[in-house]
Amino acid sequence: MTENNEHLALWGGRFTSGPSPELARLSKSTQFDWRLADDDIAGSRAHARALGRAGLLTADELQRMEDALDTLQRHVDDGSFAPIEDDEDEATALERGLIDIAGDELGGKLRAGRSRNDQIACLIRMWLRRHSRVIAGLLLDLVNALIEQSEKAGRTVMPGRTHMQHAQPVLLAHQLMAHAWPLIRDVQRLIDWDKRINASPYGSGALAGNTLGLDPEAVARELGFSRVTDNSIDGTAARDLVAEFAFVAAMTGVDISRLSEEIIIWNTQEFAFVKLDDGYSTGSSIMPQKKNPDIAELARGKSGRLIGDLTGLLATLKGLPTAYARDLQEDKEAVFDQVDTLEVLLPAFTGMVRTMHFDGDRLEEEAPTGFALATDIAEWLVKNGVPFRHAHELSGACVKLAEGRGQELWDLTDNDFIETFAAFLPADKAPGVREVLSSHGSVDSRNGKGGTAYGRVREQIADAKAEVEELKLFPASTSDGSAYKAPGTF
């Protein structure tokens, strides 16, 4: 393709000179917005057809325009066309490319009836809708990996913790599923967000709409949107939906980071709950023995990056008056970075989760330690008629007695229980507390909805699988149920 290197600007006329070199360098955005080129060309096709329907392009002109756009798309795809130094943004570059193919007279007609304001507002929506589906699919892969590990864990019991201290025994599967549900909600958030962003700003113009008789609804349909934005000012200026996506991305990072923190702790020599596959671990340049959980550490670190992208975007938006301002150029890098981060992070993280191996014997050994069955003693006492306030004190007395001897609760003698419970239970009944002094007994007793009993965990795994089956339709569909296709293929 022959490049037209003559400077092309999308504005001028009232200016006596072009932009200063300093302004040109500051304004330049092709280094990050070129990734919108495919969406821009798809939007240009739809806009050209709208111009044709409005009688602003003849049938012959429309055909030549579409042919030129197809040629431009091929040149973008094969890399023979790319931005040059003088191109301010991807829209400027693509108009230059179109004029180079179609000629100045025909190529110059495409800009009629649209502004970069409504154009870029639409492109970022198209791009985010597409990539939200990619991210949703990757998140569901991670959820499935957690479900697989939960099924594999079976009845294995581990120490549940609050404040990082031993609290109560729980099934390993229950602990893992506690991380699956937030990730499911992240996908649900993307689906809910898509309902709001599923509106095309095309036709809003700079801010007041267009006067050329164009059909925004037809353009919206061609670009995969179910409707047109209700207010042209809002259509060009609103970035709350971009910020909402940024929040979902940041929340996803936080959810992954919390799981990462547990994996990092579980993987230490002191805990030794889990071993990571060699393919998802790294070594040390100086210490031959090291096997490091780098994926979990990188995930934990990148969550801060995702939060920073959201915070920066919100700070940019907070002081803007309504209608377009150039500050809004700053919306794109934040979400581009988030998408790039998640689309690289999630496959690696899923691989780590899917291949990690838990030491069931170690988990079972640790599950009842640290007086983790103290609550079970208190609840047993309640079932035997002791008010909970007193039951709590009596259980605490058992802990104090065992702790003073360097023992665990199950090491206490029958006489210890008889003496401790003497004010509330007859001597022949007190030793019956031993029936709850096992981690499996503790787990099995917690059989309410959402509890850690084996049957309830199997129930929630089945519920999660059903939810995933429903949610996995989103990565392949638009919110109105039609197939979601690549730009330009609607």
Curated annotation (Swiss-Prot):
SUPFAM superfamilies: L-aspartase-like. It catalyses: 2-(N(omega)-L-arginino)succinate = fumarate + L-arginine. The keyword Coiled coil does not apply. PROSITE patterns: FUMARATE_LYASES. Pathway: Amino-acid biosynthesis; L-arginine biosynthesis; L-arginine from L-ornithine and carbamoyl phosphate: step 3/3. GO terms for molecular function: argininosuccinate lyase activity. Keywords: Amino-acid biosynthesis, Arginine biosynthesis, Cytoplasm, Lyase. It is found in: Cytoplasm. GO terms for biological process: arginine biosynthetic process via ornithine; L-arginine biosynthetic process. Coiled coil: none annotated. Disulfide bonds: none annotated. Its EC number is 4.3.2.1. It comes from the Bacteria. CDD domains: Argininosuccinate_lyase. Pfam families: ASL_C2, Lyase_1. InterPro entries: Arg_succ_lyase_C, Argininosuccinate_lyase, Fumarase/histidase_N, Fumarate_lyase_CS, Fumarate_lyase_fam, Fumarate_lyase_N, L-Aspartase-like. GO terms for cellular component: cytosol. Belongs to the lyase 1 family. Argininosuccinate lyase subfamily. This is Argininosuccinate lyase. The lineage of its organism: Bacteria, Bacillati, Actinomycetota, Actinomycetes, Bifidobacteriales.
